[in-house]
Amino acid sequence: MDATLALPLLIALIAIALFFDFLNGLHDAANSIATIVSTRVLRPQYAVMWAAFFNFIAFLFFGLHVAETLGKGIIDPTIVTPLVIFSALIGAIVWNIATWIFGIPSSSSHALIGGLVGAGLARTGGDAIVWTGLLKTVGAIFMSPMIGFFLALLLILIVSWLFVRQTPFAVDRTFRVMQFISASLYSLGHGGNDAQKTMGIIAVLLFSQGYLGSEFYVPFWVVITCQAAIALGTLFGGWRIVHTMGSKITKLNPMQGFCAETGGAITLFAATWLGIPVSTTHTITGAIIGVGAAKRVSAVRWGLAGNIVIAWFVTMPAAAAISALTYLAVDLFL
Protein backbone atom coordinates (compact mmCIF):
# COMPACT_ATOMS: atom_id res chain seq x y z
CA MET A 1 0.00 0.00 0.00
CA ASP A 2 1.27 3.45 -0.83
CA ALA A 3 2.38 5.28 2.32
CA THR A 4 0.82 8.64 1.34
CA LEU A 5 -2.59 7.13 0.61
CA ALA A 6 -2.56 5.39 4.00
CA LEU A 7 -1.84 8.55 6.01
CA PRO A 8 -5.39 9.27 7.32
CA LEU A 9 -5.85 5.62 8.29
CA LEU A 10 -2.36 5.54 9.76
CA ILE A 11 -3.12 8.51 12.02
CA ALA A 12 -6.37 6.89 13.15
CA LEU A 13 -4.64 3.60 13.93
CA ILE A 14 -1.89 5.35 15.88
CA ALA A 15 -4.60 7.11 17.90
CA ILE A 16 -6.25 3.74 18.64
CA ALA A 17 -2.87 2.29 19.66
CA LEU A 18 -2.29 5.20 22.03
CA PHE A 19 -5.79 4.70 23.43
CA PHE A 20 -4.83 1.09 24.15
CA ASP A 21 -1.68 2.36 25.86
CA PHE A 22 -3.83 4.70 27.95
CA LEU A 23 -6.10 1.78 28.86
CA ASN A 24 -3.01 -0.25 29.71
CA GLY A 25 -2.02 2.41 32.24
CA LEU A 26 -5.61 2.64 33.51
CA HIS A 27 -6.02 -1.13 33.75
CA ASP A 28 -2.56 -1.88 35.16
CA ALA A 29 -2.21 1.16 37.43
CA ALA A 30 -3.10 -1.12 40.31
CA ASN A 31 -0.01 -3.23 39.68
CA SER A 32 2.24 -0.28 40.47
CA ILE A 33 0.40 1.05 43.50
CA ALA A 34 -1.64 -1.79 45.02
CA THR A 35 0.78 -2.57 47.83
CA ILE A 36 1.62 1.02 48.76
CA VAL A 37 -2.13 1.78 48.92
CA SER A 38 -3.10 -1.36 50.85
CA THR A 39 -0.42 -0.65 53.46
CA ARG A 40 -1.79 2.92 53.76
CA VAL A 41 1.60 4.49 53.04
CA LEU A 42 -0.06 6.64 50.37
CA ARG A 43 -3.66 7.46 49.58
CA PRO A 44 -4.81 6.19 46.16
CA GLN A 45 -4.93 9.65 44.53
CA TYR A 46 -1.34 10.43 45.55
CA ALA A 47 -0.14 6.94 44.72
CA VAL A 48 -1.37 7.14 41.13
CA MET A 49 0.43 10.47 40.63
CA TRP A 50 3.60 8.94 42.04
CA ALA A 51 3.31 5.92 39.75
CA ALA A 52 2.43 8.02 36.69
CA PHE A 53 5.61 10.07 37.05
CA PHE A 54 7.86 7.02 37.17
CA ASN A 55 5.90 5.38 34.35
CA PHE A 56 6.66 8.38 32.15
CA ILE A 57 10.41 8.59 32.81
CA ALA A 58 10.95 4.83 32.33
CA PHE A 59 12.30 5.33 28.78
CA LEU A 60 15.39 6.98 30.29
CA PHE A 61 16.44 3.71 31.96
CA PHE A 62 15.73 0.93 29.45
CA GLY A 63 16.51 0.05 25.87
CA LEU A 64 13.77 -0.77 23.36
CA HIS A 65 14.19 -4.54 23.30
CA VAL A 66 10.57 -5.25 24.25
CA ALA A 67 9.33 -2.94 21.47
CA GLU A 68 11.47 -4.87 18.98
CA THR A 69 10.02 -8.17 20.21
CA LEU A 70 6.45 -6.92 19.76
CA GLY A 71 7.27 -5.29 16.43
CA LYS A 72 8.93 -8.24 14.75
CA GLY A 73 9.10 -11.15 17.19
CA ILE A 74 5.44 -12.26 17.53
CA ILE A 75 4.11 -12.11 13.97
CA ASP A 76 5.99 -11.65 10.70
CA PRO A 77 6.21 -7.88 10.06
CA THR A 78 5.99 -8.43 6.30
CA ILE A 79 2.37 -9.63 6.59
CA VAL A 80 1.28 -6.67 8.73
CA THR A 81 -1.40 -4.43 7.25
CA PRO A 82 -3.48 -1.64 8.82
CA LEU A 83 -6.34 -4.13 9.22
CA VAL A 84 -4.09 -6.55 11.13
CA ILE A 85 -3.10 -3.80 13.57
CA PHE A 86 -6.67 -2.51 13.86
CA SER A 87 -8.00 -6.00 14.62
CA ALA A 88 -5.24 -6.72 17.15
CA LEU A 89 -5.96 -3.48 18.99
CA ILE A 90 -9.73 -4.06 19.00
CA GLY A 91 -9.23 -7.54 20.46
CA ALA A 92 -6.99 -6.19 23.22
CA ILE A 93 -9.10 -3.11 23.96
CA VAL A 94 -12.43 -4.97 24.15
CA TRP A 95 -10.95 -7.56 26.52
CA ASN A 96 -9.25 -4.88 28.65
CA ILE A 97 -12.45 -2.88 29.03
CA ALA A 98 -14.46 -5.99 29.94
CA THR A 99 -12.00 -7.12 32.62
CA TRP A 100 -11.62 -3.56 33.95
CA ILE A 101 -15.40 -3.21 34.36
CA PHE A 102 -15.53 -6.43 36.40
CA GLY A 103 -12.37 -5.60 38.37
CA ILE A 104 -10.46 -8.63 37.08
CA PRO A 105 -6.66 -8.08 37.06
CA SER A 106 -6.01 -9.82 33.73
CA SER A 107 -3.00 -9.00 31.57
CA SER A 108 -3.10 -6.11 29.08
CA SER A 109 0.18 -7.41 27.67
CA HIS A 110 -1.14 -10.82 26.83
CA ALA A 111 -4.39 -9.35 25.50
CA LEU A 112 -2.28 -7.41 22.99
CA ILE A 113 -0.18 -10.45 22.10
CA GLY A 114 -3.34 -12.53 21.73
CA GLY A 115 -4.80 -9.82 19.50
CA LEU A 116 -1.72 -9.87 17.27
CA VAL A 117 -1.76 -13.65 17.00
CA GLY A 118 -5.49 -13.75 16.22
CA ALA A 119 -5.20 -11.13 13.48
CA GLY A 120 -2.12 -12.78 12.01
CA LEU A 121 -3.81 -16.18 11.90
CA ALA A 122 -6.91 -14.68 10.29
CA ARG A 123 -4.76 -13.06 7.59
CA THR A 124 -2.36 -15.80 6.50
CA GLY A 125 -2.71 -18.72 8.91
CA GLY A 126 0.13 -20.27 10.90
CA ASP A 127 2.83 -18.86 8.61
CA ALA A 128 2.16 -15.41 10.11
CA ILE A 129 3.42 -16.42 13.55
CA VAL A 130 7.04 -16.15 14.70
CA TRP A 131 6.77 -19.27 16.82
CA THR A 132 10.06 -18.89 18.70
CA GLY A 133 9.11 -15.40 19.88
CA LEU A 134 5.56 -16.42 20.73
CA LEU A 135 6.68 -19.48 22.68
CA LYS A 136 9.21 -17.38 24.60
CA THR A 137 6.44 -14.97 25.55
CA VAL A 138 4.01 -17.73 26.51
CA GLY A 139 6.77 -19.23 28.65
CA ALA A 140 6.99 -15.89 30.43
CA ILE A 141 3.30 -16.28 31.37
CA PHE A 142 4.35 -19.14 33.62
CA MET A 143 7.78 -17.88 34.67
CA SER A 144 7.11 -14.25 35.65
CA PRO A 145 4.65 -14.95 38.51
CA MET A 146 6.83 -17.81 39.74
CA ILE A 147 9.94 -15.63 39.76
CA GLY A 148 8.01 -12.81 41.45
CA PHE A 149 6.70 -15.32 44.01
CA PHE A 150 10.10 -16.77 44.92
CA LEU A 151 11.95 -13.43 44.95
CA ALA A 152 9.34 -11.86 47.24
CA LEU A 153 9.32 -14.95 49.46
CA LEU A 154 13.12 -14.89 49.71
CA LEU A 155 13.16 -11.15 50.42
CA ILE A 156 10.55 -11.38 53.18
CA LEU A 157 12.50 -14.18 54.88
CA ILE A 158 15.79 -12.24 54.68
CA VAL A 159 14.27 -8.95 55.83
CA SER A 160 12.37 -10.63 58.68
CA TRP A 161 15.62 -12.17 59.91
CA LEU A 162 17.53 -8.86 59.64
CA PHE A 163 14.88 -6.95 61.61
CA VAL A 164 14.00 -9.66 64.13
CA ARG A 165 15.34 -7.59 67.06
CA GLN A 166 13.50 -4.42 66.05
CA THR A 167 10.17 -3.41 67.55
CA PRO A 168 7.12 -3.68 65.27
CA PHE A 169 6.77 0.12 65.39
CA ALA A 170 10.38 0.65 64.24
CA VAL A 171 10.02 -1.91 61.44
CA ASP A 172 6.77 -0.33 60.28
CA ARG A 173 8.30 3.17 60.28
CA THR A 174 11.38 2.01 58.34
CA PHE A 175 9.45 0.23 55.62
CA ARG A 176 6.93 3.01 55.18
CA VAL A 177 9.89 5.02 53.88
CA MET A 178 11.38 2.08 51.96
CA GLN A 179 8.10 1.51 50.15
CA PHE A 180 8.52 4.81 48.33
CA ILE A 181 11.69 3.35 46.80
CA SER A 182 10.20 -0.05 45.97
CA ALA A 183 7.02 1.47 44.48
CA SER A 184 9.14 3.80 42.34
CA LEU A 185 11.21 0.88 41.05
CA TYR A 186 8.13 -1.15 40.25
CA SER A 187 6.54 1.78 38.42
CA LEU A 188 9.73 2.17 36.37
CA GLY A 189 9.54 -1.51 35.46
CA HIS A 190 5.86 -1.19 34.58
CA GLY A 191 6.41 1.84 32.36
CA GLY A 192 9.51 0.33 30.79
CA ASN A 193 7.94 -3.01 29.85
CA ASP A 194 4.32 -2.14 29.14
CA ALA A 195 4.72 1.11 27.16
CA GLN A 196 7.20 -0.60 24.85
CA LYS A 197 4.51 -3.01 23.68
CA THR A 198 2.54 -0.17 22.14
CA MET A 199 5.75 1.31 20.75
CA GLY A 200 6.32 -1.97 18.92
CA ILE A 201 2.78 -1.95 17.50
CA ILE A 202 3.08 1.62 16.19
CA ALA A 203 6.60 1.03 14.85
CA VAL A 204 5.65 -2.11 12.91
CA LEU A 205 2.67 -0.23 11.46
CA LEU A 206 4.98 2.57 10.30
CA PHE A 207 7.41 -0.02 8.94
CA SER A 208 4.69 -1.85 7.02
CA GLN A 209 3.67 1.41 5.36
CA GLY A 210 7.21 2.33 4.35
CA TYR A 211 7.74 5.20 6.79
CA LEU A 212 10.83 3.68 8.42
CA GLY A 213 12.73 2.69 5.30
CA SER A 214 14.24 -0.76 4.96
CA GLU A 215 15.12 -1.31 8.65
CA PHE A 216 12.82 -1.64 11.64
CA TYR A 217 13.37 0.84 14.48
CA VAL A 218 11.30 2.83 16.98
CA PRO A 219 11.23 6.61 16.32
CA PHE A 220 11.79 8.86 19.34
CA TRP A 221 8.40 10.56 18.97
CA VAL A 222 6.77 7.13 19.29
CA VAL A 223 8.71 6.51 22.51
CA ILE A 224 7.61 9.82 24.06
CA THR A 225 3.94 9.58 23.07
CA CYS A 226 3.64 5.99 24.32
CA GLN A 227 5.25 6.83 27.67
CA ALA A 228 2.94 9.84 28.00
CA ALA A 229 -0.16 7.75 27.17
CA ILE A 230 0.58 5.04 29.73
CA ALA A 231 1.44 7.65 32.37
CA LEU A 232 -1.85 9.45 31.73
CA GLY A 233 -3.73 6.16 31.97
CA THR A 234 -2.01 5.39 35.26
CA LEU A 235 -3.05 8.83 36.52
CA PHE A 236 -6.68 7.85 35.97
CA GLY A 237 -6.24 4.26 37.24
CA GLY A 238 -9.25 2.62 38.86
CA TRP A 239 -9.75 1.68 42.50
CA ARG A 240 -11.56 -1.58 41.66
CA ILE A 241 -8.42 -3.48 40.69
CA VAL A 242 -6.29 -1.71 43.32
CA HIS A 243 -8.62 -3.13 45.95
CA THR A 244 -8.43 -6.66 44.51
CA MET A 245 -4.66 -6.65 44.13
CA GLY A 246 -3.82 -4.85 47.36
CA SER A 247 -6.13 -6.30 49.95
CA LYS A 248 -8.40 -9.07 48.70
CA ILE A 249 -5.59 -11.51 47.86
CA THR A 250 -3.81 -11.05 51.20
CA LYS A 251 -3.47 -8.30 53.81
CA LEU A 252 -0.09 -6.55 53.65
CA ASN A 253 2.02 -4.50 56.06
CA PRO A 254 4.71 -2.05 54.83
CA MET A 255 7.54 -4.61 55.10
CA GLN A 256 5.56 -7.12 53.05
CA GLY A 257 4.62 -4.42 50.56
CA PHE A 258 8.28 -3.49 50.13
CA CYS A 259 9.28 -7.12 49.50
CA ALA A 260 6.44 -7.70 47.02
CA GLU A 261 7.25 -4.55 45.04
CA THR A 262 11.00 -5.18 45.07
CA GLY A 263 10.60 -8.80 43.96
CA GLY A 264 8.27 -7.68 41.19
CA ALA A 265 10.58 -4.83 40.14
CA ILE A 266 13.61 -7.12 39.85
CA THR A 267 11.59 -9.48 37.64
CA LEU A 268 10.38 -6.65 35.39
CA PHE A 269 13.82 -5.06 35.08
CA ALA A 270 15.37 -8.37 34.00
CA ALA A 271 12.57 -9.13 31.52
CA THR A 272 12.72 -5.64 29.99
CA TRP A 273 16.47 -5.78 29.46
CA LEU A 274 16.07 -9.24 27.89
CA GLY A 275 13.30 -7.99 25.58
CA ILE A 276 10.62 -10.26 27.04
CA PRO A 277 7.10 -8.73 27.13
CA VAL A 278 5.96 -10.08 30.49
CA SER A 279 2.81 -9.24 32.37
CA THR A 280 3.05 -6.74 35.22
CA THR A 281 -0.18 -8.23 36.55
CA HIS A 282 1.26 -11.73 36.71
CA THR A 283 4.46 -10.49 38.30
CA ILE A 284 3.02 -8.46 41.16
CA THR A 285 0.31 -11.02 41.89
CA GLY A 286 2.93 -13.74 42.24
CA ALA A 287 4.96 -11.48 44.51
CA ILE A 288 1.97 -10.59 46.70
CA ILE A 289 1.09 -14.28 47.05
CA GLY A 290 4.75 -14.97 47.93
CA VAL A 291 4.80 -12.57 50.88
CA GLY A 292 1.39 -13.78 52.02
CA ALA A 293 2.47 -17.42 51.91
CA ALA A 294 5.61 -16.57 53.93
CA LYS A 295 3.35 -15.41 56.76
CA ARG A 296 1.21 -18.54 56.55
CA VAL A 297 -0.34 -20.41 53.68
CA SER A 298 -3.85 -19.67 54.92
CA ALA A 299 -3.14 -15.91 54.76
CA VAL A 300 -3.59 -16.09 50.98
CA ARG A 301 -7.13 -16.22 49.66
CA TRP A 302 -6.38 -19.02 47.26
CA GLY A 303 -9.89 -19.08 45.81
CA LEU A 304 -9.56 -15.50 44.55
CA ALA A 305 -5.99 -16.13 43.42
CA GLY A 306 -7.25 -19.14 41.47
CA ASN A 307 -9.93 -17.05 39.74
CA ILE A 308 -7.26 -14.55 38.72
CA VAL A 309 -5.09 -17.34 37.31
CA ILE A 310 -8.04 -18.60 35.25
CA ALA A 311 -8.47 -15.06 33.86
CA TRP A 312 -4.79 -15.06 32.86
CA PHE A 313 -5.16 -18.27 30.85
CA VAL A 314 -8.35 -17.08 29.17
CA THR A 315 -6.92 -13.68 28.17
CA MET A 316 -4.76 -14.62 25.18
CA PRO A 317 -7.26 -16.93 23.43
CA ALA A 318 -10.17 -14.55 24.18
CA ALA A 319 -8.35 -11.52 22.75
CA ALA A 320 -7.17 -13.64 19.79
CA ALA A 321 -10.74 -14.75 19.05
CA ILE A 322 -12.08 -11.18 19.21
CA SER A 323 -9.24 -10.00 16.98
CA ALA A 324 -9.70 -12.76 14.40
CA LEU A 325 -13.46 -12.18 14.23
CA THR A 326 -12.87 -8.44 13.82
CA TYR A 327 -10.41 -9.07 10.98
CA LEU A 328 -12.74 -11.46 9.15
CA ALA A 329 -15.79 -9.21 9.61
CA VAL A 330 -14.07 -6.02 8.40
CA ASP A 331 -12.34 -7.88 5.56
CA LEU A 332 -15.74 -8.83 4.15
CA PHE A 333 -16.51 -5.16 3.51
CA LEU A 334 -13.13 -4.12 2.07
Segments the model singles out, each with a brief description of its role:
Residues 1-334:
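Multi-pass alpha-helical transmembrane bundle typical of ion/small-solute transporters
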